[in-house]
């Protein structure tokens, strides 16, 4: 990561009134302009200058208002499994960030077969497709087009929009806003001085707020008034061992319990929004992390990166590597030079699951 990028990220995560020198001043100026643009954009949608399309099925939007990870993908998976368990015909629509099919759009999965590679679908949609048998997953920047595809090809009754809180071009029946429990709005500044994708007052568009990683404690930022607030945690579920295979079906995965890797000496690496949280989580599970490597969020691993990872493991004298599920997807086909390769599997757990389910049924008018 370049020194400039590191400096910008430091400013974005600094205190709201902290003096960050010339870089901070420049980013503050840019963020003021960006905030004005986002307010104008919202007004243009309100006045009808920008059109909001209607889907032919019920739409549940899952998203955040900040840059970085708040658990959108685990939440989309949680909802898809829940609706599927209720006997509802559900599908997921994702933008397909980083995938070659983002502009064209298409089905990553029809609920039976995986139809696209990770490079085509994007890492997160492909991961959802693998983890959700029976649930179609489509990708594409045009969410209305994706909704029509799901309704016509799969008979979808409920469509989950992944990462769509700020995507105003499609109407939705339920708008779920995910916020980090410790810092719901970052430092309160919009991008690039802070982490906000749009001004914090726009959080009021949410029908409900979900505090993720609630086990880390709650921050002091005021959440939208009059909105139900639910809390959930990211719980380690187990470890996935990776064996490379070619084709859209991706790698062969073998599941292990959390106890299977206790005391195992590994080198860890990650390219997500909260790498340190991932490393700390491994240590808390009893994994002996002897060395670690951090990469930017959504990092595309080059041959050089992979060689550095292997060299790190060799220097640490370990026989295994461990990473996140999202990073594992980006390494499809990699044999890790004979090293064992694992990923930590994460699942959401609500503090008051029944209360949240009752809320969903009420808002979406789903019968028992």
From Swiss-Prot:
The keyword Ligase does not apply. Keywords: ATP-binding, Kinase, Lipid A biosynthesis, Lipid biosynthesis, Lipid metabolism, Nucleotide-binding, Transferase. It is an enzyme of class 2 (transferase). One of its GO terms (cellular component) is plasma membrane. ATP binds at residues 66-73. Pathway: Glycolipid biosynthesis; lipid IV(A) biosynthesis; lipid IV(A) from (3R)-3-hydroxytetradecanoyl-[acyl-carrier-protein] and UDP-N-acetyl-alpha-D-glucosamine: step 6/6. Its EC number is 2.7.1.130. GO terms for molecular function: ATP binding; tetraacyldisaccharide 4'-kinase activity. It comes from the Bacteria. It catalyses: a lipid A disaccharide + ATP = a lipid IVA + ADP + H(+). GO terms for biological process: lipid A biosynthetic process; lipopolysaccharide core region biosynthetic process. Transfers the gamma-phosphate of ATP to the 4'-position of a tetraacyldisaccharide 1-phosphate intermediate (termed DS-1-P) to form tetraacyldisaccharide 1,4'-bis-phosphate (lipid IVA). Belongs to the LpxK family. PANTHER family: TETRAACYLDISACCHARIDE 4'-KINASE (PTHR42724), TETRAACYLDISACCHARIDE 4'-KINASE, MITOCHONDRIAL-RELATED (PTHR42724:SF1). This is Tetraacyldisaccharide 4'-kinase. It comes from Desulfatibacillum aliphaticivorans. The lineage of its organism: Bacteria, Pseudomonadati, Thermodesulfobacteriota, Desulfobacteria, Desulfobacterales. The gene is lpxK.
